Amino acid sequence: MADCSYAHNTIKKRDTTVISSVDLDPAAIAIEKANKTKIYSDTLLVNGNYPDQVTRSDKFYDTLSKSRSWVARMLASLLVASHKDMDDGQTSTSKLATSRHYFQDFSGCVITQIKVVQANVFARAPGVDPGWAGRFLDNVHMLTQERVLRRNLLFNVGDTINAYRMSINEQLLRSLPYLATAYIVVSRRPLYPKEVIVSIFARDSWTISAGGKWRGHYYGDVFDRNFLGTGDELCLRYYLPIGEQLNGFEGQYTFNNFFGTFTNVKVVAGVGGSNNTARMEASRPFILPSDHIWGFRAGYTQRNCDMDTKDTTINIKMAEYALWYGYAWNLDPRLGTVFYGMFSTAYQHYYNRPEVGPMLNPFYSTTFNVMASFGFSRQNYYQGNMIYGYGRTEDIPYGYKFELAGGYQWSETRGRRYYASLTALWGNALGRGYINLAGRIGSYWTREQSWEQGVLDVSARYFSPLFKLGHIYVRQFLTFGATWGFDRFMGEREQINFTSLRDVRGIGVPREAVGCNRATLNAETVFFTPIFLYHFRFAFYLWGDVGFLGYNHMIFDNPFSSVIGIGVRIKNERLIFNNIQIRFGVALCRPGPYDFNWFDISNESTLEVDSFRPSVARPIEYR
């Protein structure tokens, strides 16, 4: 039987503990769980993977910190951390582990106490100075309120341990945007083996940031994803008066997990010459096997939109209203298999738009939709690291989803028509890596039995186990995607291009060279390095992309593009910023009208594997 008494003894007697550099050693909690799960839990372990480089690096850093130059000393203090500071060391695991295995040893035990252990953004182990920058940021940062963490728990004192529910809850905590990491540790009471104490460890992220868009629509924004430690999100955006765009201001506030209901409520209000918005939406996702999903959206939007088929911008005005509800029935409490049903309705009315007709720009037609879906779903999680992150524990879903959907649409230009779709998803870890497969097909049809605006989309994603190459860890990634459009119309959203998810990186396709069918294959070999500069980690990668885009349904007979290159991604898991990506490429083959950009610096969101959870019933997107 599992015994977590060591972890229990290291936790202070009070229910809430805030870790500082002179307080509790948080590594004890992580080490204890690591020993039980065979997964090193990312953020609190000393880095033992690179002993030679750590020793050499420490000598260099010590020399730099003792330099006579005040500039060198300042840089060493601000930017460089030795392995002693690396309390979230990049500890690797070459295999995925099922997240619920750790909790199965405690199944049926009664929870007698729930403790919360919190760490500030840059808090270190005892005796380790985070440096003046870390101390300053921790002092400025407002720690997440304890009640915010507790209302994200799916269990209470007096409940019995359910391994599946606990693993779902741990993943839920780690997915919160204001936490750098979170995990759950269970310890038995010394004299009462059927009673346990549950300890929640959570380390905050630095959640204040800024961003913007400098192409097409120009704006800058500042946001806080943990406003005043409440877990809510605040975003303020200013639209710059450049070109045809006028001054504009927009504010967004999101109440996350509103009053502990796991419902997120978002309010958006904006005013300006070309951007006016008033919108409110609320949504509650599926979380547990037997659960509800519901939501609504209502609002008015006026915004400049770039047209895909013409070199012009049109000020779009629209009102939209949507409502959805669903329920899932648990068929297997141990594995989380569910049968679910879903209902949704949506109305969109356009006041200003491009020209529309029976076969032109159906995307901008006023429509009323009613849809229903049902299916089977199962989702569990593996835990690993150095996949899409840079050392923190990552939750990779595995399972399946099979869904049938259908409905009715009234369109001002097409009249009454019907819709049907089929979705099949599957993902799991095999002997030599993880594979995720997806297939979707859907189409409208009219009372005259004519099929229209059909789409078929298939995809496959693979990543290999983690290999060690000297002091570097290597993982191989492959992604394939193919999309066919059938009986499409003319105008906006009726053709497709390369996108951020289905891309040949660096290739630019002009408007006159898009198509209805597309296939892409992306390959990456990623090298996770031991380079560590004040929690910024570096991953270098070799990449190659091929793509086909055109109107031929024999998809590999369409115009062909091929690119190879190298790049580096830089990520600080403690900060809310996206990855910084620097990429170089060479085009091996591209059609004459295509553009190519051999160099790019960008912000890149961390990729995620498709979820198998039930979702809102809606037509399959053609994108």
Predicted regions and their residues:
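Outer-envelope beta-barrel architecture signal
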Residues: 110, 194-196, 206-208, 230-234, ...
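Periplasmic polypeptide-binding modules associated with outer-membrane biogenesis and secretion
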Residues: 9-221, 237-239, 248-252, 273-279, ...
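Residues that define the transmembrane beta-barrel architecture of outer-membrane proteins
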Residues: 214-218, 245-249, 274-278, 315-323, ...
